Regions:
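Catalytic NTP-binding/metal-coordinating core of nucleotidyl cyclase/transferase enzymes
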Residues: 1-75, 79
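Generic non-transmembrane alpha-helical segments
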Residues: 33-48, 79-83, 87, 232, ...
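Catalytic beta-strand-to-alpha-helix segment of the class III nucleotidyl cyclase homology domain
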Residues: 66-176
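C-terminal tail/extension regions appended to the core domain(s) of diverse proteins
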Residues: 163-217, 224-227
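Hydrophobic ligand-binding cavity/cleft-lining segments
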Residues: 204-253
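Glycine-rich portal/gate segments that line the openings of hydrophobic small-molecule binding cavities
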Residues: 240-241, 250-298, 311, 338, ...
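Beta-strand/loop substructures that line and gate deep hydrophobic ligand-binding cavities in soluble
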Residues: 289-345, 353-356
């Protein structure tokens, strides 16, 4: 029986410096630490991506077309790199072990390769394998000129991936680079400096709302992992499923949701304006809202994984110029409580990104 071709995004997350690390570290410790790092990376990529297989010091994942929009896929790539760097930092600062495996772990880094194309699934030795020219091309990037030149701390996207994900490379400061491979030819790619984004993220102060300043302070345990919860919380196509009949118009720099994205949410004749002012995928987001009849409001959402669930905490605070009276505050609280209850209900009954 012939296989049915599919199209989607192909991702390879590769640990840089793994061979040197393994050869210089204790064999009883190094594979465990490297495995922990790969598990951290895959945990942030999956969902929206699915793990195809682990390939030594790399993880190969994919997402079929229609599984998640381009912004959510970019969120996953960035979140994986940030989670990897945070895990390295915790190993470096929190361990008292003096073995080489722990001491040398901070020398590891990560590079991510993203391509979009066609593939088929084949059953080999009892396992599903992805195959096709585009799968080969994605793997060729691992040994390309950019990987050899830059070393680590970057994401390399083929032109096909950029087009499929709707990325505006100039607005995301992505450098152009051409690869050339035998039997494939020239491949135009774009490089994202993940290390620079991590540095900027580490230096940026997170927006927060103190409990005593909050006019809304709600927390709920939802039956989904942080990636699914984040998607339903932020995606214009998923928000109406729990926020009600709203029409959302979004404008994003670089075709990616993040700091600077503005949104107009229209319910009936009323429109709420939103601007994202803090964006840490799967962990934290903050918005500045212009709410009809009330004025400027600051809002934050914090997500924390708890087994297979997520603790979602939502806070709103009146910003300077707001005119919220006691009745307004009580109405807002009731609306947010009801919305979060609907979100939990939707997430409890849906087929999540991990199972689609």
């Amino acid at each position: 029986m012939s296989a049915t071709p599919e199209t989607g995004t192909l991702v390879l997350a590769d640990l840089t410096g793994y061979t040197a690390y393994l050869s210089q570290s204790e064999i009883e410790h190094a594979p465990t630490i490297a495995g922990d790092l790969l598990e951290t990376i895959v945990g942030r990529l999956e969902p929206p991506f699915r793990l195809a297989k682990l390939e030594g010091d790399a993880a190969f994942l994919y997402a079929e077309d229609g599984r998640a929009d381009g912004s959510l896929q970019l969120d996953a790539v960035e979140a994986a790199y940030f989670a990897f760097r945070r895990r390295l930092r915790s190993i470096d600062t929190a361990t008292s072990c003096d073995c080489n495996a722990c001491a040398l772990a901070p020398r590891l880094d990560l590079k991510v390769f993203v391509h979009h194309g066609a593939f088929v699934r084949s059953r080999i030795a009892g396992r599903d394998e992805l195959a096709g020219p585009d799968v080969i091309l994605a793997h060729r990037l691992l040994k390309g000129a950019i990987a050899a030149k830059r070393g680590s701390g970057f994401g390399q996207f083929t032109a096909a991936a950029v087009t499929a994900l709707g990325i505006r490379t100039d607005e995301l400061d992505m450098a152009t680079a051409r690869e050339s491979f035998d039997h494939v030819g020239d491949v135009d790619t774009f490089v994202m400096d993940l290390d620079a984004r991590w540095t900027a993220e580490s230096d940026r102060r997170q927006m927060s709302i103190a409990p005593e300043a909050a006019i809304v302070d709600e927390s709920i345990l939802v039956p989904a992992d942080p990636a699914d919860c984040w998607a339903y919380l932020t995606s214009p196509s998923l928000r109406p499923l729990w926020e009600g009949p709203i029409v959302i118009t979004e404008t994003s720099p670089g075709a990616r949701r993040g700091v600077g994205t503005t949104t107009q949410c229209v319910t009936g004749r009323l429109a709420t304006l939103e601007e994202i002012v803090d964006w840490q995928p799967y962990d934290h987001a903050a918005w500045r809202l212009a709410v009809p009849g009330i004025g400027p409001v600051d809002a934050t959402a914090d997500l924390e994984g708890a087994d297979d669930n997520t603790r979602l905490s939502l806070r709103w605070a009146a910003a300077p110029g707001a005119i919220a009276g006691p009745d307004d505050v009580e109405r807002i609280r009731a609306e947010r409580r009801a919305a979060l209850d609907r979100l939990a209900s939707v997430l409890g009954s849906r087929v999540g990104l991990a199972e689609v």
